[in-house]
C-alpha cells in the first residue's frame, strides 16, 4: 500500500464561486476521489489554513508521495512546513508539484533557483520520463509516457 497526501491551498474554491462549482470538495478532494479508485492507496489531504498547514512530522512519516497544488499563497506556507517536506523528500518521499507550484517555497528550495519560467503554447507532444522507476508510485508505469498536446515550459 502506498500513502499519498494531497496538499492544496484551498483558497480559490472558497473565494471563487465558479471554482467552487467545479470543485465542491476542493481540488484536493477531486484528486482524492480519482485516486481512491485504487484500493491499494491510502489517501489523506492537507490544506494551507489547517494548523501547521495540515503537515506534521507524524503525518509525513509514512508518506510515499506528497502531491502539492499551490497558486497564489506560496508565501503563506510556514517555514516549518517547508523544512519538514524538504527533509522527507531528501529521505526518499516523492513530491509531485502541480500547476503554479513552481513558485512554491518547497519547489524553489529543492530546485535551488528562483523557478521563474518561460513557456510556449504550440500544442506540442511532451515526453515525461520516470526518473525513479523503483518508487512505489511508479509501479506498472512504462519508462516514459507522452502527452500529445502540451504547453512547454523552460527556465529563462
Predicted feature residues:
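Glycine-rich, phosphate-binding/catalytic loops in enzymes
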Residues: 22-24, 82-86, 107, 112-114
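Conserved short-loop catalytic and cofactor-binding motifs
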Residues: 15, 19, 73, 125
Amino acid at each position: 500500500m502506498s500513502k499519498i497526501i494531497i496538499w492544496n491551498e484551498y483558497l480559490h474554491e472558497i473565494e471563487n464561486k465558479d471554482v467552487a462549482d467545479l470543485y465542491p470538495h476542493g481540488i484536493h478532494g477531486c484528486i482524492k476521489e480519482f485516486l481512491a479508485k485504487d484500493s491499494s492507496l491510502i489517501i489523506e489531504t492537507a490544506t494551507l489554513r489547517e494548523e501547521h498547514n495540515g503537515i506534521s512530522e507524524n503525518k509525513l512519516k509514512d508518506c510515499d508521495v506528497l502531491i502539492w497544488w499551490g497558486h497564489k499563497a506560496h508565501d503563506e506556507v510556514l517555514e516549518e512546513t517547508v523544512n519538514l517536506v524538504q527533509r522527507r523528500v531528501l529521505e526518499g518521499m516523492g513530491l509531485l508539484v502541480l500547476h503554479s507550484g513552481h513558485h512554491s517555497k518547497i519547489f524553489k528550495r529543492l530546485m535551488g533557483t528562483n523557478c521563474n519560467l518561460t513557456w510556449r503554447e504550440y500544442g506540442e507532444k511532451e515526453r515525461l520520463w520516470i526518473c525513479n522507476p523503483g518508487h512505489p508510485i511508479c509501479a506498472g508505469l512504462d519508462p516514459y509516457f507522452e502527452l500529445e498536446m502540451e504547453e512547454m515550459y523552460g527556465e529563462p
